[in-house]
UniProtKB/Swiss-Prot annotation:
Molecular function GO terms recorded: proton-transporting ATP synthase activity, rotational mechanism
Main function: F(1)F(0) ATP synthase produces ATP from ADP in the presence of a proton or sodium gradient. F-type ATPases consist of two structural domains, F(1) containing the extramembraneous catalytic core and F(0) containing the membrane proton channel, linked together by a central stalk and a peripheral stalk. During catalysis, ATP synthesis in the catalytic domain of F(1) is coupled via a rotary mechanism of the central stalk subunits to proton translocation.
Family of the protein in this entry: Belongs to the ATPase delta chain family.
InterPro entries to which the protein is assigned, alphabetical: ATP_synth_OSCP/delta_N_sf (IPR026015), ATPase_OSCP/dsu (IPR000711)
Origin: domain of life: Bacteria
Assigned keywords, A-Z: ATP synthesis, Cell inner membrane, Cell membrane, CF(1), Hydrogen ion transport, Ion transport, Membrane, Transport
SUPFAM superfamilies: N-terminal domain of the delta subunit of the F1F0-ATP synthase
GO terms for cellular component: plasma membrane; proton-transporting ATP synthase complex
PANTHER family: ATP SYNTHASE DELTA CHAIN (PTHR11910)
Cell compartment(s), UniProt: Cell inner membrane
Protein name: ATP synthase subunit delta
């Protein structure tokens, strides 16, 4: 449920910022840096600290760092809802949704052995046609997938591995057997 709640909050933030995404993204990065401090996290998750005190602290940070009002108001809602501990996950999903909105995504390509340029080019062509341009590509090998590839984007996974195909055949076989 936590992941779903993070997604919903991130979706709301994407809708709120609309054309102001660059300024808000910079503000989020500043907030994430501040939230890395253990004392800051402890302050915002402490149920004995009144909500008004937390809001005042956020407004002080807003003034000091020139943060967007929409962003700070959004964080106030997250704090009020008791989800400050999920803020990092919310922002991570926000960036993924924003990249998706812009036709971009982070991509990880996993193959059993290193891909040739031709193989990688073919995979990227297919993914670009369906999802847009990857912003960053991470390549790694995992002999455990036996062959083929797995492409993981921010919001999608394409499993064209042999292990994935075997898993799908197993699922279909079980359905066929149990439906008799």
């Amino acid at each position: 449920m936590k992941g779903r709640a993070e997604y919903v909050y991130a979706r709301v933030l994407v809708d709120l910022v609309k054309d102001n995404s660059e300024e808000v993204s910079a503000g989020i990065r500043s907030l994430l840096c501040a939230c890395e401090d253990r004392d800051v996290r402890a302050f915002f998750v402490d149920p004995t600290v009144p909500f008004g005190v937390k809001v005042a602290a956020l407004r002080d940070v807003q003034k000091a760092c020139a943060l967007d009002d929409t962003l700070v108001s959004f964080v106030c809602v997250v704090v009020e809802d008791g989800l400050f501990a999920s803020l990092g996950g919310i922002f991570e999903k926000f960036f993924a949704l924003l990249r998706r909105k812009l036709g971009k995504f982070n991509l990880e390509i996993i193959s059993a052995a290193p891909l040739t340029e031709k193989e990688e080019s073919k995979i990227l062509r297919m993914l670009r046609a369906q999802y847009g341009d990857p912003e960053a590509i991470i390549r790694r090998t995992d002999p455990g997938i036996l062959g083929g590839f797995v492409a993981k984007g921010d919001t999608f996974t394409v499993d064209a591995s042999y292990v994935g195909q075997l898993r799908e055949l197993t699922r279909i076989s079980k359905e066929a057997v149990f439906s008799i």
